[in-house]
Amino acid sequence: MIEAFLLGIILGLIPITLIGLFVTAYLQYRRGDQLDF
């Protein structure tokens, strides 16, 4: 029961973590573009 609960939390956190990484990478990329100007 506890293992299934932890598995659900992990599966829920993985997409959030990936989205956070993509957002930070995108913001750094745009910031670099602005600095190039």
UniProtKB/Swiss-Prot annotation:
BP GO annotations: cytochrome complex assembly; photosynthesis
Protein name: Cytochrome b6-f complex subunit 5
Cellular component GO terms held in the UniProt record: cytochrome b6f complex; plastid membrane; thylakoid membrane
InterPro entries (UniProt xref): Cyt_6/f_cplx_su5, Cyt_6/f_cplx_su5_sf
Sample GO molecular function, one term: electron transporter, transferring electrons within cytochrome b6/f complex of photosystem II activity
Membrane-spanning residues: 5-25
Domain of life according to the entry: Eukaryota
Record's keyword annotation contains Membrane: yes
Family note: Belongs to the PetG family.
Major localization class: plastid
Keywords: Electron transport, Membrane, Photosynthesis, Plastid, Transmembrane, Transmembrane helix, Transport
Annotated localization: Plastid membrane
Coiled coil stretches, renumbered: none
Function: Component of the cytochrome b6-f complex, which mediates electron transfer between photosystem II (PSII) and photosystem I (PSI), cyclic electron flow around PSI, and state transitions. PetG is required for either the stability or assembly of the cytochrome b6-f complex.
Topology relative to the membrane: Single-pass membrane protein
Assembly and binders: The 4 large subunits of the cytochrome b6-f complex are cytochrome b6, subunit IV (17 kDa polypeptide, PetD), cytochrome f and the Rieske protein, while the 4 small subunits are PetG, PetL, PetM and PetN. The complex functions as a dimer.
